[in-house]
Amino acid sequence: VGTDAAGNLIGRREGTQPGLAPLVTGSHCDTVMGGGRFDGILGVLAGLEAAQSLHEGGVLLRHPLEVIDFLSEEPSDYGISCVGSRAFAGTLDAAMLACRNEAGESLAEAMRRIGARPDGLAAAARGPGGIAAFVELHIEQGPVLEREGLPIGVVTDIVGIRRIAFAVTGQPDHAGTTPMDIRRDALVGAARLIDAVHREASAMDGHPHYVVATVGRISMSPNVPNAVPGRVDMVLEVRSNAQAVLDDFPERVMALCHDDFRRLRVGCSAMPLTQTPPTQCDGIVMRAIAQAADRLALPHRALPSGAGHDAMHVAATGPMGMIFIPCLDGRSHCQEEWASKEQVAAGARVLAEALRVLDAR
């Protein structure tokens, strides 16, 4: 057991065949503020349990087995998520390391503070072909498996995420003396845009791609009770497993609102913020997970992940797949996050068996 230059905690069990790349499992132990006890932590503890069960059963794998607790998967004070898995893949670059929190501390400085070595990240990077396969066990963080009464999900892909800043501009005026028919109310225009986002994502989802979209940040000026809003700034986040949807969605909702904006006499501009492409799970790993579930007589279904995970970065180093288990009411990133002992055990059993299947191929 040791810590790499990126601060990832890594346990390794050697295999019987020298020179083979490792099979890797794991996740993360950090949480969002007010988060629960299963997101990420499940994958780390289940990986340890899989390694322990192999040891207790006297099962020797051909490949080395590594269990990794990746550093800082959740969004950090430095504006960077998946710090450890990005470093593992060799994509944690100088610009990211230079990002600072509100106190002025850089990500690199914070990593040094906890004992990592950001100047030596090259040693932590595995690069393409650096692993034999990666399997991450995780709660679904959604309602599908629970709703369908299924214990196991085989993840097909991890959504890409695109964020766009919209500015709706009108004209601030006196709320009491400006007639309704001549107002240029930016908030009304913003409301039309938010409604279009909801309607368009609802119409597109499942035909055939996974699509969700949210306006989760909004600010307004003058933002006082007695003035017509003159400007609204907001951030749209769209998630999909199809790059074409990510590329087109902002323009689609703008087009839907064109006539409304004209009637309301408001303008609207869009500025791209960030974009992460979708990540496909590897077919070999998906089949290994499904085969493992079948061997254990555990029903399963394929489904996409609507959340980002360390796995999407680790995919740059080798074949990647994910196992989902249900969580109560689909809740996550909250204190109510929960999975039963039986659900956790089923996921851990599938993980251990999938590693054996992958080792034998």
Please report, for each region that a protein language model flagged, where it lies by residue.
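Acidic/His- and Gly-rich active-site-bordering loop/insert found
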Residues: 1-36, 54
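Zn-dependent metallopeptidase/amidohydrolase metal-coordination segment
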Residues: 2, 26-27, 300-349
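Flexible, glycine/charged-enriched surface loops at secondary-structure junctions
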Residues: 4, 60-61, 121-125, 177, ...
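Acidic, glycine-rich active-site loops and adjacent beta-strand->loop/helix elements
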Residues: 7-9, 29-32, 65-76, 141, ...
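Alpha-helical metal-binding/catalytic segments enriched in His/Glu/Asp
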Residues: 25-28, 34-74, 162-168, 179-201, ...
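Midchain, well-structured core segments that form catalytic/ion-binding scaffolds
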Residues: 73, 79-243
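Short beta-alpha connecting loops at secondary-structure transitions
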Residues: 94-95, 239-242, 273-275, 330-342
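A short beta-alpha structural unit
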Residues: 214-221, 235-241, 267-286, 312
